[in-house]
Curated annotation (Swiss-Prot):
Protein name: Glutamate 5-kinase
UniProt binding sites for ATP: 7, 167-168, 208-214
Principal location: cytoplasm
Location of the protein in the cell: Cytoplasm
Superkingdom, taxonomy of origin: Bacteria
Entry EC no(s): 2.7.2.11
GO terms classed as biological process: L-proline biosynthetic process; proline biosynthetic process
Catalysed transformations (reactions): L-glutamate + ATP = L-glutamyl 5-phosphate + ADP
Entry GO CC: cytosol
UniProt GO MF annotations: ATP binding; glutamate 5-kinase activity; RNA binding
Amino acid sequence: MVALVVKIGTSSLSDPSTGDLRLATLGGLAETLTRLRRAGHRIILVSSGAVGVGCARLGLKERPATVAGKQAAAAVGQGLLMSMYDRLFGALGQPVAQVLLTRQDLMDRVRYLNARETLSELWRLGTVPIVNENDTVATDELRFGDNDALSALVAGLVEAQWLVLLTDVAGLYSANPRLDPQARLLSEVTEISEELLQSARGRSLWGSGGMASKLEAARIAASAGVATVITEGNTPQNIERILAGEAIGTRFALARPGGRLSLRKRWIGYGLVPAGALHLDEGAVLAVREGGKSLLPAGVRGVEGRFETGALVRLIDGQGLEFARGLVNYSSEELEKIRGRKSHEIAALLGIEGQPPTAVHRDNLVTLS
């Protein structure tokens, strides 16, 4: 028996031209997930669509441009979306539960663990939790951005074995198949490198409008030991075939050395929002990435942003690529004073005795892979 998180996007659950829900697809999804639940699997559905459904009900021809407009549409649409899911699953005798999360819920350690306990209890009670971002109250600077990231964080939170991302394409392609007859579907990706992510963001990969976020989600999931598959959403029955071992869509291999990160490390690496960045020299990059060492002030070349002690920062290599994240022992102002200097100089530079010798201790540091 496995724990499975399935994410369905707006493009799969509604008609883009009218905003109407694709009830045949959603009915098939409800039937598939109900069969899996009755077979003993633990299922979570992460569903987008509240804003789109709200716009359709309000008769809006376009998505609102303002944050307030989107939040108002989500307030209208979320209830309608859950009502639809309750009818579809209810007709099959399968209870569902609504769980709305914000980024703050996963940034705060106590709320993070409480969300985990709530989802576990909903499983124990035999429900299929249906998760969405709480769009009505989420602030623009602290949004997940899309439900791909949310689904990956939830998969890690509950220690799922599988994350299935349902979308409007068959998977990840080597190029745009509409323009390149040589484009091929990639059945497996063994490494989600920063270069691959940059390629997706640069629109050289088919479906890159939403593919970059799916690659990010697969990387987050991999850090938690979760296998990810991207596949076309109009045939939800494929989920059962994927669990049976069939090669459908694009599967992302679990290539992280050392396996699953601890729950705390996953919270540090992916639950928090970075407040700034540290640019490192080559020696520091090697020590942190290859040697698993703490980051010393001597290896910091530059400080980006303003932040306080204990904030999460991104660690940047010489090519400008993020390769790790960690909680800092010093504020940005203090790091500007001690960067590039030896640890024994810290007290004199800051005028305070007994300061930690590390800028980021390895216990509070996560390398990204």
